[in-house]
Amino acid sequence: MKTAQIRQKFLDYFESKGHIIESSASLIPHNDKTLLFVNAGMVPFKDVFSGIEKRPYTRAVSVQRCARAGGKHNDLENVGYTARHHTFFEMLGNFSFGDYFKREAIHYAWEFLTKELNLPKKNLWVSVFDQDNEAEDIWVNEIGFPKNRISRCGAKDNFWQMGDTGPCGPSSEIFYDHGEHIAGGPPGHANEDGDRYIEIWNLVFTEFDKQEDGYLKPLAVPCVDTGMGLERLVAVLQHKNNNYDTDGFQNLVKAVVNLTPKFNNIKDNNASVRVITDHIRSAAFMIVDGVIPSNEGRGYVLRRIIRRGIRHGHKMGIGKVFFYRLASILALEFKDVYPELEQALSKVEKVLKREEQRFSKTLDQGMSILEEVITNFKGSEINGKIVFKLYDTYGFPVDLTSDIARERNLTIDMSGFEVEMTKQRDRARQASDFKISEKGVDIAERTEFLGYKQLKNVSLIQAIINNNELVEKIEVGDHGIVVLAQSSFYAESGGQIGDKGILSNMQVEFRVDHTNKQKSGAFEHHGVLNKGVLKVSDAVQANVDKKSRKCIARNHSATHLLHAALHIVLGKAVMQKGSLVGSEKLRFDFSYDKVIVKSDLERIESIVNRKILGNTKVYTDITNIEGAKKKGAMTLFGKKYGDTVRVLTMGKNEFSVELCGGTHVNQLGDIGLFRIISESSVSAGVRRIEALTGYDAYQFDNRIQNSLNKIAQMTRSSNTEVVGKVTQLIKQQKELEKQIATFQKKIANNQGDDLIVQAQEVKGIKLLSTVVEGVTSKDLRNIVDKLKDKLSSAVIVLAVVINDKVSLVTGVTKDLTKQYQARKILNHVAKQIGGKGDGRSDMAQGGGTKPECLIKALASVKSLI
């Protein structure tokens, strides 16, 4: 049975049992800061298990893309060295949200394995939580499973939790016994770590929600969460002891082997082949879901995965850029299941290729230094300072150092490395200051939002929060948070800032500075009481600041037009990565891997302004997610949407169609004017555009016009002539700079000739160690080069002081480089003047910050000869 058939059979079976099929969510968890990646099938349902979110069904089944390469669940280090570990895998799962529980879950699992897949019953083994008598009773008395093939295990093995907090509960695991010819014992036994008994399905009976203090809070309704790794199941059904030998991996495995030089005689089961095969899967899908290689968070995990794969390719002798070539084979493998990979293939290949090209130099440098260390190394553990230097100076990842050391039967001194990292963090921390916000008071009541159609309303006060506590009242001057039953104030969400305004009645006035929304849907009106005493259950009139709301609406509608214009000019692959819609300006972050040229920015701006001049009506439609997709609405991949969604349509021929809960203009002409004020890079592969609208855009243009008038006045030209005049001045300046450079070069050449006579002979070697004046650092290097040509058997150390900083250059003629290293001589001098440097054996360059120590330091060179 092929992988595709097994995947579909699982979905079909549970659909026949009343489960709704859910598509795989993005690898990036939605609205969950506790996880780097979706690492289990239940993650997209986390809020459902916790009772925060409700779905229109109580049974679900899915095949979820998962990644375990960072955070608590991290299999990265094991990939390649075992037959079963992966950084990317698919998890089959069936879920019950307060519907069925242990009995049905166990019966379904047993029926699917033994009847649908025809697995031999004699090859199955089961484990249960040692305190879960109910589960064991179902297995023994209802299923008829032999008690002597049931292991009772502790919380470490059979009490599952996704993170430090959140849904959790006892579990029952099903194992497959590969037979006596393979080493290893059953779960719970001393030799359980062998490959004979392989876990294939984990049934989690979610009864609790673990709190931050460790308390196991019972869930309102018990749930079921099961997970079965597709790759492991396929290996069992295809009678393979190695996941990489199954049909789902073989095309990639063969492609990797074919990339290696024939004389290397690489086998299919080579550890490096497994690493590359696995890592291209996780890297490609991470990029599809919007992750870009960087030095932090998810981007750093992706970078580690890509670079680890590349390193193993180099180890096998693949000398060319190769990793990105595998993406097309992967896309073909998954085209029927995950067509989004094929659609984004060009982007995936581009990101992978660029990262490999960037890493090649780092890999060569780091490997050279590490090989030198290992060759001369006599112990069993590489010093942490060396590991840190490779990481900090050359950008060589610690996990690669560890990987290479492991291959040579060495370990790395991680504690020593962490000491060096701590020192670095302490240095960095001195330049930063950050605070951790305290957890606020949770309000269960949901606020009804009225602000789409009105800017004021009357409502009762549901709650008042002061100093992080619920209070009955606040008085004049008190800062507080007011929660209303109904509100016209928009609460910050979807990138749009919250409204400001006034809550008042005859006796009180509360100034609202901003409005937030709790997870429950309660609106928090933050501000200060200007008049009277405000009490819970008081009736107040909520008045939104009309001017601020109009500015925000202009900017939000302009953001939608900008998004659509980006798709036209830069292509459909552009994905929204974040936005901030305020009253003064808008900011839009999006995926794009190069600087946007000026002509494209002008075209984007022009498209938006033409739509504004068209002054078409903005249409709002309430529908379900499927209806929205039929309209062509842009959705954020991986984001969860409710039963009903709000669709905003702008411009002729549905120019922009997006799902949005924000506030907008009624006519596009209300935006007035759109002006891009900046375009920049936020991180690798993510660009940012900032723009102004309306009167703010007009004022921006006015300031530019005033500046142009001043420049015209200073250059004694008209506004239409000013560009030509400034161009002429710049040309003149460059000519003058060339003349200055020519004069400086002549001075430097003359200094070189003058310096020859200062060379002194020490033990048959000419030594020149002195300070020169009136030259640049670049000139200094040229002077040393010429002196090396004119002086035979010479050691030269020259320094220049510019703005209280010392520049140093050392040179050694080639006949002396075996006796004297320019790099070592430079560091000898640099240390004495508070600096450092680097270079080759015949030429090195550096500097320092203590010019007062320079003369003494230069004199000390003589002692080295």
Curated annotation (Swiss-Prot):
Keywords: Aminoacyl-tRNA synthetase, ATP-binding, Cytoplasm, Ligase, Metal-binding, Nucleotide-binding, Protein biosynthesis, RNA-binding, tRNA-binding, Zinc. GO terms for cellular component: cytosol. Its main location: cytoplasm. Its EC number is 6.1.1.7. Transmembrane segments: none annotated. Zn(2+) binds at residues 556, 560, 660, 664. Binds 1 zinc ion per subunit. InterPro entries: aa-tRNA-synth_II/BPL/LPL, Ala-tRNA-lgiase_IIc, Ala-tRNA-ligase_IIc_anticod-bd, Ala-tRNA-synth_IIc_core, Ala-tRNA-synth_IIc_N, Ala-tRNA_ligase, Ala_tRNA_ligase_euk/bac, DHHA1_dom. It is found in: Cytoplasm. GO terms for biological process: alanyl-tRNA aminoacylation; negative regulation of DNA-templated transcription. It catalyses: tRNA(Ala) + L-alanine + ATP = L-alanyl-tRNA(Ala) + AMP + diphosphate. Catalyzes the attachment of alanine to tRNA(Ala) in a two-step reaction: alanine is first activated by ATP to form Ala-AMP and then transferred to the acceptor end of tRNA(Ala). Also edits incorrectly charged Ser-tRNA(Ala) and Gly-tRNA(Ala) via its editing domain. Belongs to the class-II aminoacyl-tRNA synthetase family. Consists of three domains; the N-terminal catalytic domain, the editing domain and the C-terminal C-Ala domain. The editing domain removes incorrectly charged amino acids, while the C-Ala domain, along with tRNA(Ala), serves as a bridge to cooperatively bring together the editing and aminoacylation centers thus stimulating deacylation of misacylated tRNAs. NCBIfam families: alaS (TIGR00344). This is Alanine--tRNA ligase. It comes from Vesicomyosocius okutanii subsp. Calyptogena okutanii (strain HA).
